[in-house]
């Protein structure tokens, strides 16, 4: 992920300073899509492991999320 961000930032800096070639623009778009895919996957994975508790201490995790969690447990 660090290398991915490094490449994205290098292309962004180059775009600001001198512009990008068509190939570099395509590469930049592909890198950004890959980055977003990884971030979304991480967020989704984190949400699949969340339990929601109300102020009274009751589990109020949505049914759909509980079903996903049950599938992940096997």
From Swiss-Prot:
It is found in: Cytoplasm. Keywords: Cytoplasm. GO terms for cellular component: cytoplasm. InterPro entries: DUF896. The keyword Cytoplasm applies. Coiled coil: none annotated. Belongs to the UPF0291 family. PANTHER family: UPF0291 PROTEIN CBO2609/CLC_2481, UPF0291 PROTEIN YNZC. This is UPF0291 protein lmo0496.
């Amino acid at each position: 992920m660090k290398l991915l961000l490094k490449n994205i930032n290098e292309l962004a800096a180059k775009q600001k300073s001198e512009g990008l070639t068509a190939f570099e623009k395509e590469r930049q778009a592909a890198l950004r899509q890959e980055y977003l895919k990884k971030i979304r996957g991480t967020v989704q994975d984190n949400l699949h492991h969340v339990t929601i508790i109300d102020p009274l201490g009751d589990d109020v995790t949505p049914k759909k999320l509980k079903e996903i969690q049950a599938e992940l447990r096997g």
